[in-house]
């Protein structure tokens, strides 16, 4: 008799059937991943791969996980955000016999405990690959090894409430795990593929400092990720999150978007399409000029604070909305973030104020003067905390890139092809990902003749643009 599978932590395993139905629907909208299964499945390029995955545990991620396993991988999974898990998706993955540790609304203590559990491989041993979103799994190993090697001073100097919890976990691991625990993990990891802007920044910082432990592929800067997921995904999911959280009428409202990168561009478009009058703040003169040329009013946060009804941060930086900005806002202004971390808004400065929870991930905070502010998802990702994130179709492009990156690092890293540096996928694969999604939406591609291809110096089948081309 087969032992019952128990290597998971989910809210309710009874939600698995519901999750499976939604996974089936999502598969129809994710042609890139399904085509990847069909092309690579017989070759099993990930056979022997043990992938530690830290990425929002959504229905779309479930399709990614099952693509990785269809290609031969063994997987353990956690969410990379305490509010982004879809509990029925996690239940479906657990019911399929895949270890997953994720609950929507989990505590930060549980979040880091689950991350640690992800590295304790079933049957012994360690993972040999990481699939990351935001870099927390990568940082867990890097900082754990640093402390294991004797540099522990940083553990007593946390820079945030979350680091207090994270560093306490590392201290616990150093005390309880056998000597050399982190060194063994670090030795076995062949590479990491990173999903998002914030995690990519961390990787480049480590590369610059010479501390990166293994090769990394920057999935975020694949064109079919950043120019689609970051832009078109946010264009659909931002307003979805705000509406589900507040039921507010967007038309006629004044909205302020901090940051006009790809995420900011999508966010501003989302609000404009909903009928809001949109202002933008920027530090980069190029992005500021782009915003102005798109017809947005470019102002500072100080200008916008007393005027706007809705505030959205999309910068990847810290302290974008300060306590002073919040004090200057209108009564019941709506404040949210669509960047990866929660430090774009000074949430810590609000902890001593009066909080009233309206419903999950919606809080009303009252200032001493009686003014109130509506905060969504406690400053974490509003589109995943208050809604269900990006639609399946756009995530198919991102996750096809992730799958190809895992294959590159695990199966194609021959003769030291990938060193301890950060790479991007080649243009040919970027174009392949795009091509896989065309038929689903009825796109008919024009084909170059040989003489036309020769004239512009490309191959008939592509790639069609130089690496330096900006889409």
Curated annotation (Swiss-Prot):
Keyword annotations from UniProtKB, A to Z:
Cytoplasm, Hydrolase, NAD, One-carbon metabolism
Q: How is this protein named in the record?
A: Adenosylhomocysteinase
| Gene3D superfamilies, per database record | Adenosylhomocysteinase-like, NAD(P)-binding Rossmann-like Domain
Top-level taxon of the source organism? Bacteria
Native organism is Rhodopseudomonas palustris (strain BisB5)
Tell whether Cytoplasm is among the UniProt keywords: yes
Question: Where does the record say this protein resides?
Answer: Cytoplasm
Which reaction is catalysed here?
Answer: S-adenosyl-L-homocysteine + H2O = L-homocysteine + adenosine
Q: For substrate, which residues are the binding ones? A: 58, 133, 195, 225, 229
Q: What biological function has been recorded for the protein in this entry?
A: May play a key role in the regulation of the intracellular concentration of adenosylhomocysteine.
The cofactor note from the UniProt entry for this protein is: Binds 1 NAD(+) per subunit.
Which SUPFAM superfamilies does UniProt cross-reference here?
Answer: Formate/glycerate dehydrogenase catalytic domain-like, NAD(P)-binding Rossmann-fold domains
UniProt lists the family membership as follows:
Belongs to the adenosylhomocysteinase family.
Query: Which EC number(s) does the record attach to this protein?
Result: 3.13.2.1
The pathway is: Amino-acid biosynthesis; L-homocysteine biosynthesis; L-homocysteine from S-adenosyl-L-homocysteine: step 1/1
The GO terms describing molecular function are:
adenosylhomocysteinase activity
Q: Which GO terms describe its biological process?
A: L-homocysteine biosynthetic process; one-carbon metabolic process; S-adenosylmethionine cycle
Q: Which SMART domains match?
A: AdoHcyase, AdoHcyase_NAD
What InterPro entries does the database record attribute to this sequence? Adenosylhomocyst_ase-like_sf (IPR042172), Adenosylhomocysteinase-like (IPR000043), Ado_hCys_hydrolase_NAD-bd (IPR015878), NAD(P)-bd_dom_sf (IPR036291), S-Ado-L-homoCys_hydrolase_CS (IPR020082)
Residues annotated as binding NAD(+) are 196-198, 230, 259-264, 282, 317, 338-340, 383
Name its co-factor(s).
NAD(+)
Signal among keywords: no
Recorded hits in HAMAP family, A to Z, give: AdoHcyase (MF_00563)
Please give the GO cellular component terms listed in this UniProt entry.
cytosol
């Amino acid at each position: 008799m087969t032992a019952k599978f128990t290597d998971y932590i989910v809210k309710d395993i009874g939600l698995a059937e519901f999750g499976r139905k939604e996974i089936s629907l999502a598969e129809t909208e994710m042609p890139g991943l399904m085509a990847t299964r069909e092309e690579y499945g017989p070759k099993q390029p990930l056979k022997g791969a043990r992938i530690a995955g830290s990425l929002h545990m959504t229905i779309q991620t479930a399709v990614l996980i099952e693509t990785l396993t269809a290609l031969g991988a063994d997987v353990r999974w956690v969410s990379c955000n305490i509010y982004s898990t879809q509990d029925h998706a996690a239940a479906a993955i657990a019911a399929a016999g895949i270890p997953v540790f994720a609950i929507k609304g989990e505590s930060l203590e549980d979040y880091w405990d689950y991350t640690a559990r992800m590295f304790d491989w079933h049957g012994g041993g360690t993972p040999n690959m990481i699939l990351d979103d935001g870099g927390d799994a990568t940082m867990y190993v890097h900082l754990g090894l640093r402390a294991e090697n004797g540099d522990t001073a940083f553990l007593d100097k946390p820079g945030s409430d979350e680091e207090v919890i994270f560093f306490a976990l590392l201290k616990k691991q150093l005390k309880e795990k056998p000597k050399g625990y982190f060194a063994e993990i670090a030795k076995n990891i062949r590479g990491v593929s990173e999903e998002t802007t914030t995690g990519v920044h961390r990787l480049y910082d480590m590369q610059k400092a010479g501390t990166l432990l293994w090769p990394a592929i920057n999935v975020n800067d694949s064109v079919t990720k950043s120019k689609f997921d970051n832009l078109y995904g946010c264009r659909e999911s931002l307003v979805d999150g705000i509406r589900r959280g507040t039921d507010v009428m967007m038309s006629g409202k004044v909205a302020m978007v901090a940051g006009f990168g790809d995420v900011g561009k999508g966010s501003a478009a989302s609000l404009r399409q909903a009928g809001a009058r949109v202002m933008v703040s920027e530090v980069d003169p190029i992005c500021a000029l782009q915003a102005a040329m798109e017809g947005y009013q470019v102002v500072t946060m100080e200008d916008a604070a007393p005027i706007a009804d809705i505030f959205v941060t999309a910068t990847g930086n810290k302290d974008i909305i300060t306590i002073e900005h919040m004090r200057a806002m209108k009564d019941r202004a709506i404040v949210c973030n669509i960047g990866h971390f929660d430090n774009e808004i000074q949430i810590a400065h609000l902890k001593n104020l009066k909080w009233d929870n309206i419903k999950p991930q919606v809080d009303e905070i009252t200032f001493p003067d009686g003014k109130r502010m509506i905060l969504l998802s406690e400053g974490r990702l509003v589109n995943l905390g208050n809604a269900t994130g990006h639609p399946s179709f756009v995530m198919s492009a991102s996750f096809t890139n992730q799958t190809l990156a895992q294959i590159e690092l695990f199966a194609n890293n021959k003769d030291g092809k990938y060193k301890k540096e950060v790479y991007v996928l080649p243009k040919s694969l970027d174009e392949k990902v795009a091509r896989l999604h065309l038929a689903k939406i009825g796109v008919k591609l024009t084909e170059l003749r040989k003489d036309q291809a020769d004239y512009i110096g490309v191959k008939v089948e592509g790639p069609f643009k130089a690496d330096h081309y900006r889409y």
